[in-house]
UniProtKB/Swiss-Prot annotation:
The keyword Signal applies. It comes from Staphylococcus aureus (strain Mu50 / ATCC 700699). This is Protein map. Residues 1-30 form the signal peptide. The lineage of its organism: Bacteria, Bacillati, Bacillota, Bacilli, Bacillales. It comes from the Bacteria. MAP repeats lie at residues 45-153, 154-263, 264-372, 373-476. PROSITE patterns: MAP (PS51223). Keywords: Repeat, Signal. Transmembrane segments: none annotated.
Length: 476
């Protein structure tokens, strides 16, 4: 009985000690980390914040349309950010953990709204214990150099450029297919790489390829020859090819099923878009792959499609535009101008091979000029940061300094995280309005008294915002 009593007492003490340790640990964690209201269980949902990011691989940047999503005002660790960064590296560029470990360099930079930044090594596996608030992050840039310095030339990599054409539309690809130099590879291995970039760059899966009208890739060799491979056949030649002999690879997929199965020549016609007097360089072309002969009604539909895709101009925008037309330039020197809003089409047919280029011109109505964009700078405690965006000010009527105050406070909050309360306790908070006539007006952001003067947004040249905060004394 004494033995049983001893065991019972020992177990009880162990439970109490364990409970006490857990309680102390939780208490210490709660004391070390401030309560994050966005993650409280009292709330039914989270308010998210979108943080833009860029990826640079071997010196080549890629335009990223998506953003990293975090809970607003959440305190997170650098390990949490690293997991997000590794995820988008794998999803957007196919770079795995192994690739990062074997890379020459792999790092990401966190840019903060106060103008500071922090560089983190993705290969180190060492994390600082600091926590950062998601609302303080302005952007994240990821930089990976996968090119290991080869100890001998036999181990160097070869980069093979490739293009992807889907339904007649080409896309400019900034990355390359990577192979070991002088590596003998099979067409099956090559097909695996091609299918991988089709899925990562254009979202085309194996199922999409099987159901497509046509799916093939062309291997262009440095000796001038080429070989076309059907991605749907599943049949592979036993020949091996040397990676150093490949000049480029062209991938072509037509996902549009048609009744006719005749293979026809693919005609590409270059085009440009001029919107409100500003032209942009268009890397893709208009394609006439299935029917080189077309009427002007179909051509107008294609023009409207690229306007929507490239510049976001809808049918409604064209309807209210001041001007909306396109000019077809022919190889024989002739040209034809067609109105995009007209419903009357000539019965003439045009052959794609006769078209030299197409210029699209759109001038939007007064709706596009309803706002004026004024450049501005922000200096906090004497440190300025370049602002890529501009202050959007209504151009419809005369504005007051109270209206301008609200705009300035809004960008201070969004760009540098400075709230109304921060301004109230700031040492100094003001902005200077520079007018085009050479005059200027200094406005105190801490004052609620405004001059009754009204002025037009078109008269403003620029705005400089200056905030000086009291420095916090360090606790000893």
């Amino acid at each position: 009985m004494k033995f049983k009593s001893l065991i019972t007492t020992t177990l009880a003490l162990g439970v109490i000690a364990s409970t006490g340790a857990n309680f102390n640990t939780n208490e210490a964690s709660a004391a070390a980390k401030p309560l994050d209201k966005s993650s409280s269980t009292l709330h039914h949902g989270h308010s998210n914040i979108q943080i833009p990011y860029t990826i640079t691989v071997n010196g080549t940047s890629q335009n990223i349309l998506s953003s990293l999503t975090f809970n607003k005002n959440q305190n997170i660790s650098y390990k949490d950010i690293e997991n997000k960064v590794k995820s988008v590296l794998y999803f957007n560029r196919g770079i795995s953990d192994i690739d990062l470990r074997l890379s020459k360099q792999a790092e990401y930079t966190v840019h903060f709204k106060n103008g500071t930044k922090r560089v983190i090594d993705l290969k180190s596996g060492i994390y600082t214990a600091d926590l950062i608030n998601t609302s303080d992050i302005k952007a994240i840039s990821v930089n990976v150099d996968t090119k290991k310095q080869p100890k001998d030339k036999a181990k160097a990599n070869v980069q093979v450029p490739y293009t992807i054409t889907v339904n007649g539309t080409s896309q400019n690809i900034l990355s390359n297919l990577t192979f070991n130099k002088n590596q003998n590879i099979s067409y099956k291995d090559l097909e695996g790489k091609v299918k991988s970039v089709l899925e990562s760059n254009r979202g085309i899966t194996d199922v999409d390829l099987r159901l497509s009208k046509q799916a093939k890739y062309t291997v262009n060799f440095k000796n001038g020859t080429k070989k076309v491979i059907d991605l749907k056949s599943g049949i592979y030649t036993a020949n091996l090819i040397n990676s150093s002999d490949i000049k480029s690879i062209n991938i072509n997929v037509d996902t549009k099923k048609h009744i006719e199965n005749k293979a026809k020549r693919n005609y590409q016609v270059p085009y440009s878009i001029n919107l409100n007097g500003t032209s942009t360089n268009i890397l893709s072309n208009l394609s006439f792959s299935n029917k080189p002969w077309t009427n002007y009604k179909n051509l107008t539909s294609q023009i409207k499609s690229v306007l929507k895709h490239d510049r976001g101009i809808s049918e409604q925008d064209l309807k209210y535009a001041k001007k909306a037309y396109y000019t077809v330039y022919f190889k024989n020197g002739g040209k034809r101008i067609l109105q995009l809003n007209s419903k009357n089409y000539t019965a003439n047919l045009v052959h794609a091979k006769d078209v030299k280029r197409i210029e699209i011109t759109v001038k939007t109505g007064t709706k596009a000029k309803a706002d004026r964009y004024v450049p501005y700078t922000i200096a906090v405690n004497g440190t300025s940061t370049p602002i890529l965006s501009k202050l959007k000010i209504s151009n419809k009527q005369l504005i007051s300094y109270k209206y301008l105050n609200d705009k300035v406070k809004s960008v201070l909050k969004s760009e540098r995280g400075i709230s109304d309360l921060d301004l109230k306790f700031a040492k100094q908070a003001k902005y200077t309005v520079y007018f085009k006539n050479g005059k200027k007006q200094v406005v105190n952001l801490k004052s609620d008294i405004f001059t009754p003067n009204l002025f037009s947004a078109k008269d403003i040249k620029k705005i400089d915002i200056d905030v000086k905060q009291y420095t916090k004394s360090k606790k000893k």
